[in-house]
């Protein structure tokens, strides 16, 4: 028994949870015969997502029968996993009195205090752990992060450098080191040092260090050039190839990244067995990355076919994660959840699986189960406080607030993480009604994002300006009624955060309606139009001028393209809802393609929309959704929105239903009856309980729509009125056409990118 217990502890401490779990299952009955065995089985059950079974085993353990630091240390860890922090602290401290104390006990005490924001206590115990095991890179790294959070950059730098001397390929430590040098204004020194080294001895290691440093510093164009040159000079080194892919992904160059991955996978002669000892495993990971990019680009069928061809696919957590993403894109949230639950059984401590499962469960309204799994994530990774506070509906302890403030204000923490902490902290402070501090934090979070994106409001203004000029009554009259007669699509559109998700969920709870979410098909049609024109022998004009070349054949062809793709998502319901908010840019095209389609436009108080957008950490921040991170940019987008919708109403009188968000919150049944009547749908009582549906919600409104209709967001802007001068000034300015010199700059940027999807990051 003692050798089995020792072996299990060794596996667990080395983070080999897969073998740890298998060994527990193989020796389950044997382990039940001892107190220490029951504790280890409790840990196994917790990692397997079965906290109730862990609690049952814990209740059978007699703490007084444990007479070793090891046994008490495991018991304290199990208490910690189950959220019984006071018991965990008491038992772990009791273990200190025994002679067999090891570095793991001190490390666990450090993690316990760190998770509570008690940095001094955490530092004390992690330093004790390090004194027993000076070469433990994980403890060096944790201490480095702790000193970062305390603002002690030089101490943190020393610890990360020590970790890197022991483990040169420790990427996380390398990133932290770079961030510290960046915050100390010493990044140029490091970059110059690497460039000099590259001139003297241009080897793979220097290319990798330089590329990673530039990437972490946000100098993406330089990083891309370095990785590209390195990959060409050293084609057999996989790290340079992967570095290039990561930079391309960060730059939003999805197509280029996917093309390279496809080339490298089709011809694997570049793989050197010495440099890539696990060749098959490495190529499999590249294959998963390619399919991830395919899913992002909405090539779902291609990705799915390739994933199903993977041999022994059940042995890869990535297979489950990517397959669940495909299911979510197809609005099959329940299937995605079941698949990920199966993955959790096989990989109980895989953070990627657990995080994806939390996301899916939240989207289908299984909030209690999502909270349980989030607690497992925090137990495995105590720094996941941002997600933990989100799951607790932004109710945070004082210690958690301190951690969030530290993350937000630490210049050595990645900007993306700092911004995420800021957006969450804003919601926490808003919930506490500390509105002034909340908005100050929100400004800081948005400014951090702005430093990372390249957005110009004039690009969208120019497209709207040209659309208004091109879509004349004469053009509409020539094409009116020539599109596809289908009544199947219902388009819900308007400014992001105006109530489009709520409206989709109401309609989607009707038995005749399938809520498809934010479909990319209308923007895709717009992007494909030049090729379509060329194919039929017409001048390949870009949008919106392309509408001048349209005829009945092209309209019906575009509509059929849309209907074919919708049919792959659902073939059972007679109606389907497409709720891509920014389809307001393309209402003219939609109503010409589908003259019998229903178009529902959400209108909401401009300032409420402005505040709500500014409060969201949108994932699609590199595209058109970049407008949401600056109050003036939001004002310009609101002006664009108002101008184009006024134009569509003039061209298509009576064909667009105006749904007032405030009226919906005040008179829900009356408004919903009008909505169903407009959509030619019979009344069903179930539409009033839309929030009970298990269909997934994938947008920024993921939590709100699970609570039913609520009025707390109406007139919300008044809390922050004194901060809204920038957006108010732009709204008063109204929609102004760009002048000729400005037009020259933007005439090649016709289609704004990133319209598809605006989920929260």
Curated annotation (Swiss-Prot):
Protein sulfotransferase-like: annotated segments: 487-761
Which keywords does the record carry?
Answer: Repeat, TPR repeat
Q: Which SMART domains match?
A: TPR
The record, for Pfam families, names: Sulfotransfer_3 (PF13469), TPR_16 (PF13432), TPR_19 (PF14559), TPR_8 (PF13181)
Keyword flag Lipid metabolism:
no
Q: Look up the domain of life of the source.
A: Bacteria
Q: In which ranges do the TPR repeats occur?
A: 35-68, 69-102, 103-136, 137-170, 172-203, 204-237, 351-384, 419-452
Q: Which family does it belong to?
A: In the C-terminal section; belongs to the protein sulfotransferase family.
- What is the name attached to this protein's record? Uncharacterized protein aq_1088
Q: Please give the organism.
A: Aquifex aeolicus (strain VF5)
Q: What is the lineage of its organism?
A: Bacteria, Pseudomonadati, Aquificota, Aquificia, Aquificales
């Amino acid at each position: 028994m003692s050798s089995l217990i020792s072996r299990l502890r060794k596996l667990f401490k080395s983070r080999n949870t897969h073998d740890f779990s298998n060994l527990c299952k193989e020796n389950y009955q044997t382990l039940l015969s001892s107190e220490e065995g029951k504790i280890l089985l409790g840990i196994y059950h917790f990692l397997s997502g079965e906290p109730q079974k862990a609690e049952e085993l814990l209740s059978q353990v007699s703490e007084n029968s444990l007479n070793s630091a090891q046994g008490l240390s495991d018991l304290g860890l199990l208490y910690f996993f189950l959220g019984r922090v006071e018991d965990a602290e008491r038992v772990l401290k009791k273990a200190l009195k025994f002679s067999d104390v090891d570095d793991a006990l001190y490390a666990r005490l450090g993690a316990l205090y760190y998770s509570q924001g008690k940095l001094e206590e955490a530092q004390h115990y992690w330093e004790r752990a390090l004194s027993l095991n000076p070469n433990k890179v994980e403890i060096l790294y944790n201490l480095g992060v702790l000193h970062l959070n305390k603002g002690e950059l030089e101490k943190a730098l020393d610890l990360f450098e020590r970790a890197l001397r022991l483990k040169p390929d420790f990427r996380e430590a390398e990133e932290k080191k770079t961030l510290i040098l960046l915050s100390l204004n010493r990044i140029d020194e490091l970059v110059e040092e690497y460039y000099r080294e590259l001139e003297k001895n241009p080897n793979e290691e220097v290319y990798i260090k330089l590329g990673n440093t530039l990437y972490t510093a946000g100098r993406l164009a330089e990083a891309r050039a370095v990785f590209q040159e390195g990959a060409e000079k050293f084609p057999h080194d996989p790290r340079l190839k992967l570095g290039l892919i990561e930079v391309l992904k960060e730059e939003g160059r999805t197509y280029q990244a996917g093309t390279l991955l496809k080339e490298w996978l089709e011809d694997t002669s570049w793989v050197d067995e010495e440099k890539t000892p696990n060749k098959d495993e490495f190529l499999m990971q590249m294959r998963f990355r390619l399919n991830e990019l395919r899913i992002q680009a909405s090539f779902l069928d291609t990705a799915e076919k390739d994933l199903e061809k993977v041999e022994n696919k059940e042995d890869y957590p990535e297979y489950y994660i990517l397959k669940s993403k495909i299911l979510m894109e197809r609005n099959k949230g329940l299937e995605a959840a079941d698949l990920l639950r199966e993955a959790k059984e096989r990989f109980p401590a895989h953070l990627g699986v657990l995080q994806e499962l939390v996301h899916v469960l939240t989207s289908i309204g299984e909030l209690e189960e999502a909270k349980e799994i989030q607690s497992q994530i925090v137990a495995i990774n105590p720094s996941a406080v941002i997600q933990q506070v989100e799951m607790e509906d932004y109710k945070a302890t004082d210690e958690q607030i301190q951690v969030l403030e530290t993350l937000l204000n630490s210049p050595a923490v990645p900007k993306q993480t700092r911004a995420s902490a800021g957006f969450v902290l804003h919601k926490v402070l808003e919930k506490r009604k500390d509105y002034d501090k909340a908005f100050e934090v929100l400004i800081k979070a948005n400014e951090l994002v702005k430093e990372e994106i390249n957005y110009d409001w004039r690009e969208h203004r120019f497209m709207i300006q040209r659309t208004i000029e091109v879509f004349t009554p004469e053009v509409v009259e020539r094409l009116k009624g020539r599109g596809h007669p289908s009544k199947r699509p219902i388009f819900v559109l308007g400014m992001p955060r105006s109530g489009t998700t709520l409206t989709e969920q109401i309609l989607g709870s009707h038995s005749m309606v399938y809520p498809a979410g934010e479909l990319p098909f209308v923007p895709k049609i717009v992007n494909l139009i030049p090729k379509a024109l060329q194919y039929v022998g017409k001048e390949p004009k870009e949008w919106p001028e392309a509408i001048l070349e349209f005829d009945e054949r092209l309209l019906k062809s575009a509509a059929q393209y849309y209907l074919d793709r919708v049919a792959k998502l659902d073939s059972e319901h007679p109606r389907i809802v497409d709720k891509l908010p920014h389809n307001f840019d393309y209402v003219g095209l939609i109503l010409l393609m589908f003259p019998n389609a229903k178009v529902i436009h959400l209108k909401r108080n401009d300032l409420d929309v402005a505040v709500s957008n500014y409060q969201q950490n949108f994932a699609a921040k590199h595209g058109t959704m970049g407008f949401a991170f600056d109050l003036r940019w939001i004002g310009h987008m609101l002006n664009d929105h108002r101008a184009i919708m006024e134009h569509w109403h003039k061209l298509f009188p009576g064909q667009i239903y105006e749904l007032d968000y405030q009226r919906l919150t005040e008179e829900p049944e009356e408004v919903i009856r009008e909505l169903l009547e407009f959509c030619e749908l019979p009344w069903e009582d179930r539409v009033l309980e839309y929030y009970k549906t298990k269909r997934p919600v994938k947008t920024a409104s993921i939590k709100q729509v699970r609570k039913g209709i609520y009025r707390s967001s109406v007139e919300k802007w008044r809390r922050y009125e004194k901060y809204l001068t920038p957006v108010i000034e732009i709204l008063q300015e109204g929609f102004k056409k760009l002048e000729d010199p400005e037009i020259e700059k933007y005439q090649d940027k016709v289609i704004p990118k990133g319209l598809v999807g605006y989920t929260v990051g």
